């Protein structure tokens, strides 16, 4: 039998701690189990959404409801595995007029690789052609180092790729919604998204990668994008790396004091393309 190291959680309520313990129970190398000193609270939830956009919209709606119920924005956080996941939340929350503060990363449209991509897209506005504009976007970003497949090594290279890939996905999404859209329409839509990203505010909800949320706590925490390939990340290939992903989920869950809402989306796009599966880390969890 394994001896468990019991550690008291003064932060999270019993339902959150019980769920976090279930996650760690599958990691034989980690004997820590938490015991809550805070007592009962609302059950944690897990929701599947049809697309990334729907996930961000519905989380935005729930955040607005929490704020209306009296929770201050600074007591709310949305956590995710990789920095490029922030863009859709920046846009959706900005559209709702909810101020956001990004932790451990620049706002999406302020990232150097994104600024450079926009400059190059603008430079390509005069190029006339009959091809779908999303292909032109791929060509332009391809000249900046984007490839259809994520690079295997180097955190910096991966983060740059993820930012550029987000732009490719936004192009695909606009193309799917409006077959007649051209490159100028796409650049205009990016400018609009950029404007919707609010200036930082002291009383803002936090958007953060799980790594940059370590050691912090909020009243209400949304952990988004819990699909296979995101958490666990696609390049976690060894048992050790997989257990590291499991511990990241545990860290994300135990940032919440009272409310914990987990979610994932069944596809990347609203048209159902980019099919996803629920994270294996959520398998067999009892809510």
Residue ranges and their predicted role:
Residues 83, 104-111:
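Conserved helicase motor
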Residues 5-8, 47-51, 106-109, 152, ...:
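Pocket-edge positions in alpha/beta enzyme catalytic cores
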Residues 80, 107, 266-267:
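Conserved beta-strand edge residues that scaffold enzyme active sites
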Residues 1-2, 8-98, 124-126, 161, ...:
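Helicase P-loop NTPase motor core
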Residues 86, 90-98, 111-287:
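Conserved helicase C-terminal RecA-like lobe
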């Amino acid at each position: 039998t394994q001896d468990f190291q019991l550690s008291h959680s003064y932060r999270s309520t019993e339902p959150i701690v019980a769920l976090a313990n279930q996650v760690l129970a599958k990691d034989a190398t980690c004997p820590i189990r938490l015991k809550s000193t805070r007592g009962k609270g609302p059950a944690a939830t897990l929701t599947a959404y049809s697309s990334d956009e729907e996930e961000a919209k519905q989380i935005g709606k729930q955040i607005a409801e929490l704020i209306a119920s009296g929770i201050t924005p600074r007591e709310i956080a949305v956590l995710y595995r990789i920095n490029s996941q922030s863009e859709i939340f920046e846009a959706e929350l900005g559209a709702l007029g909810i101020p956001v503060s990004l932790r451990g990363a620049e706002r999406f449209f302020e990232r150097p690789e994104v600024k450079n991509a926009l400059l190059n897209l603008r430079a390509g506005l005069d190029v006339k052609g009959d091809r779908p504009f999303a292909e032109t976007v791929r060509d332009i970003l391809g000249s900046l180092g984007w490839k259809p497949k994520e690079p295997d090594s180097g955190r910096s290279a991966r983060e740059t790729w993820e930012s550029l890939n987000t732009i490719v996905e936004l192009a695909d999404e606009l193309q799917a919604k409006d077959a007649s859209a051209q490159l100028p329409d796409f650049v205009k839509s990016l400018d609009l998204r950029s404007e919707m990203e609010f200036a930082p505010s002291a009383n803002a909800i936090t958007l953060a990668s799980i790594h940059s949320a370590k050691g912090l706590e909020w009243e209400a925490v949304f952990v988004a994008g819990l699909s296979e390939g995101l958490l666990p990340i696609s390049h976690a290939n060894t048992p050790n790396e997989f257990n590291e992903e499991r511990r990241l989920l545990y860290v994300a869950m135990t940032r919440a004091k009272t409310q914990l809402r987990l979610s994932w989306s069944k596809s990347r796009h609203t048209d159902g393309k980019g099919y996803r599966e629920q994270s294996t880390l959520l398998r067999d969890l009892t809510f």
